[in-house]
Amino acid sequence: MAKEPARVKRRERKNITSGVAHVNASFNNTMITITDAQGNTISWSSAGMMGFKGSRKSTPYAAQMAAEDAGKKAAEHGVKTLEVNVSGPGSGRESALRALQAAGMTITTIRDVTPIPHNGCRPPKRRRV
């Protein structure tokens, strides 16, 4: 009794013309998620997913590669215009924006949604190198 091979469900092509790109640029990695207006994920990518490891994940080039990848995947679903929400203090913020434009997306608005504490938790102590 041989088990029949599992059928791989193909991703159906969504016809969405506009979306929201969430760029999360931390000190260690850059993650780009492209969603529709309701927040359902269309495509996503990160610097680590592109094969960068360790401290190379936090570079602007890694963020550029991740944004290009997420933009190409979203373009397959018909996304042409994007609103961009940028979050975090990382070095890949601007390069991710430029890469999304280079991937053929029209950027309508850019919003900085970095959470700023109203004197919340104590930050980690300064590094002494």
Swiss-Prot record:
PANTHER family: 40S RIBOSOMAL PROTEIN S14/30S RIBOSOMAL PROTEIN S11. Part of the 30S ribosomal subunit. Interacts with proteins S7 and S18. Binds to IF-3. GO terms for cellular component: ribonucleoprotein complex; ribosome. InterPro entries: Ribosomal_uS11, Ribosomal_uS11_bac-type, Ribosomal_uS11_CS, Ribosomal_uS11_sf. It holds the Pfam family Ribosomal_S11. GO terms for molecular function: rRNA binding; structural constituent of ribosome. GO terms for biological process: translation. This is Small ribosomal subunit protein uS11. Transmembrane segments: none annotated. NCBIfam families: PRK05309.1, uS11_bact. Located on the platform of the 30S subunit, it bridges several disparate RNA helices of the 16S rRNA. Forms part of the Shine-Dalgarno cleft in the 70S ribosome. Belongs to the universal ribosomal protein uS11 family. It comes from the Bacteria. Keywords: Ribonucleoprotein, Ribosomal protein, RNA-binding, rRNA-binding.
